[in-house]
């Protein structure tokens, strides 16, 4: 199981805590050369749906770019995609009062293992 990484509000840059997790992903992918993953990025519910789709795609791309920059073959990440605010992990949808920590849980990239050899 690979831990999700998290993003600051309205940002898509890789934070230092996320870089540590991504380095673990790279280590794992180097250990298992047949491992293929998909990246799924998300936002919290603040901002317009369309804007959040664009933002989540930028998050997916920055995550992909980081992993590729560490020498992983792009063929091993055949798909990276943003889902905007369509897959919230909690009750924090439009108009619901939530704490900063609750919103943070939704600003994430998840890693789905497609193949493991």
Indicate where each model-derived feature is located.
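Periplasmic OmpA-like peptidoglycan-binding domain that tethers envelope proteins to the cell wall
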Residues: 40-117
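Pro/Ala/Gly-rich low-complexity, hydrophilic intrinsically disordered segments
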Residues: 1-3
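Periplasmic peptidoglycan-binding/anchoring modules of Gram-negative envelope and division proteins
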Residues: 6-41, 64-69, 111-117
């Amino acid at each position: 199981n690979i831990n999700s990484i998290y993003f600051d509000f309205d940002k898509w840059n890789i934070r230092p805590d996320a870089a540590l997790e991504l380095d673990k992903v790279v280590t794992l992918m180097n250990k298992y050369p047949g491992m293929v993953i998909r990246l799924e990025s998300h936002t919290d519910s603040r901002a317009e749906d369309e804007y959040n789709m664009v933002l989540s795609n930028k998050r997916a791309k920055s995550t992909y770019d980081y992993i590729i920059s560490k020498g992983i073959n792009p063929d091993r990440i055949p798909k990276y995609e943003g889902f905007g605010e369509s897959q919230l992990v909690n009750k924090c949808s439009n108009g619901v009062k939530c704490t900063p920590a609750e919103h943070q849980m939704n600003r994430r990239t998840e890693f789905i293992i497609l193949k493991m050899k």
